[in-house]
């Protein structure tokens, strides 16, 4: 039995479409609001947080490396996330209890490359751009 067809079936078709929409994964995700609740940033592009600890995350096969990451507790909601520290030696600019600005990292809601479970990256440390510290254009403020 297919969909109804006839002169007076518009309401039936409209209701059928409304019900069947919920079986579409992408529609359900965008309209239920659960994806927004699960997102640590709560829909924002960036978030500030406090560094809890520095950690090394092992890269997935076939690569062999320890990717430098930090555990961050977000100020806005207290959620704890793992954020990647880009560039060589930039972990040295970050200390525990520093305030950092965290941004998304590549594919939304997914880990990037060979770093398992890491969906965010560090952008600023103590309100100074991590890239500026790395290139030597700015110095870390004395605290």
From Swiss-Prot:
The keyword Ribosomal protein applies. One of its GO terms (biological process) is translation. Pfam families: Ribosom_S12_S23. Its main location: cytoplasm. GO terms for molecular function: structural constituent of ribosome. The keyword Ribosomal protein applies. It is found in: Cytoplasm, Cytosol; Cytoplasm; Rough endoplasmic reticulum. Transmembrane segments: none annotated. This is Small ribosomal subunit protein uS12. One of its GO terms (cellular component) is cytosolic small ribosomal subunit. It comes from Ciona intestinalis. InterPro entries: NA-bd_OB-fold, Ribosomal_uS12, Ribosomal_uS12_euk/arc. Belongs to the universal ribosomal protein uS12 family. NCBIfam families: PRK04211.1, uS12_E_A. The modification Hydroxyproline is found at residue 62. Keywords: Cytoplasm, Endoplasmic reticulum, Hydroxylation, Ribonucleoprotein, Ribosomal protein. PROSITE patterns: RIBOSOMAL_S12 (PS00055). Component of the 40S small ribosomal subunit.
């Amino acid at each position: 039995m297919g969909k109804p067809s006839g002169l007076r079936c518009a309401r039936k078709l409209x209701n059928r479409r409304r019900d069947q929409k919920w079986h579409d994964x992408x529609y359900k995700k965008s309209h239920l609001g659960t994806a927004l609740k699960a997102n640590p940033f709560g829909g924002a592009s960036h978030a500030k947080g406090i560094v809890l600890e520095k950690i090394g995350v092992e890269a997935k096969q076939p690569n062999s490396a320890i990717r430098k990451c930090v555990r961050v507790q977000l100020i806005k909601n207290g959620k704890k996330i793992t954020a990647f520290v880009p560039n060589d030696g930039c972990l040295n600019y970050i200390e525990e209890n520093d305030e950092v600005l965290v941004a998304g990292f590549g594919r939304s809601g997914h880990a990037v490359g060979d770093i398992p479970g890491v969906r965010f990256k560090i952008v600023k440390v103590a309100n100074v751009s991590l890239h500026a510290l790395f290139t030597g254009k700015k110095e870390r403020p004395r605290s």
